[in-house]
Amino acid sequence: MRTATITEFSSSYRSLPGLLHLLQFGDSALPIGGFSFSNGLESAIQQNLVHDKETLREFTLTAMNQAATSDRIALLTAHRAARADDRGALQVIDKAVFERKLNEETRLMTVRMGRKLCELSASIIDDRLNRDWLECIKTAETPGTHPVSLGLAFAALDVDGRDAFGAQQYGVATTILGAALRLMRVSFMDTQKILLEATSTVAPAYEEIADAGIEDMASFAPMVDILAAVHVKGHVRMFMN
């Protein structure tokens, strides 16, 4: 039986805290309000665009692709700016994210979750930049979007950009699939099968945008904006978007 060397144990222990931080801040149960949002699924079901496991699969993969080319680019650029302590760049990124949210509900979602996350980070992480960023949000110097707050938190915790990207793409999928279990007739087996396929798209998606700048951030999803507009006027709503 092979015995692990001291070097291997040391390497494992060095990486373990980062892994645990990733799990904590990538958890859908993190108390920042993510469970209140369905990423557009509720309206998609009400409009019969999603009605079975196959249309749910298509919706989930589309949402992940949209997130990869928009909020995830913001996450990575904010992560790099935070590591460089470039506060001017952080404000530019934050405003760019907010301006690209075309409807009321997605704007509400990103700033509400962003502020809650920054309040949490500033309270439990010993990092001056996170505390200063919270003050900027409170004084309305910056919108305080979720991707930027997350980039700051992961930078302070020394989680690398690739892992941060992966955690958040996983979060998009689990948010949608968790909402699906409450909104439509679909089994846990079905959602887990979709999740397994969805996670296989994360690494290729990262490679495509790893070096992207904020000017590359874009998404073309007119149906999502239409569904959000419909949802605002909905009379029966389980989720906030």
Swiss-Prot record:
It comes from Brucella melitensis biotype 1 (strain ATCC 23456 / CCUG 17765 / NCTC 10094 / 16M). UreD, UreF and UreG form a complex that acts as a GTP-hydrolysis-dependent molecular chaperone, activating the urease apoprotein by helping to assemble the nickel containing metallocenter of UreC. The UreE protein probably delivers the nickel. It comes from the Bacteria. Keywords: Chaperone, Cytoplasm, Nickel insertion. It is found in: Cytoplasm. This is Urease accessory protein UreF 1. The gene is ureF1. Its main location: cytoplasm. InterPro entries: UreF, UreF_sf.
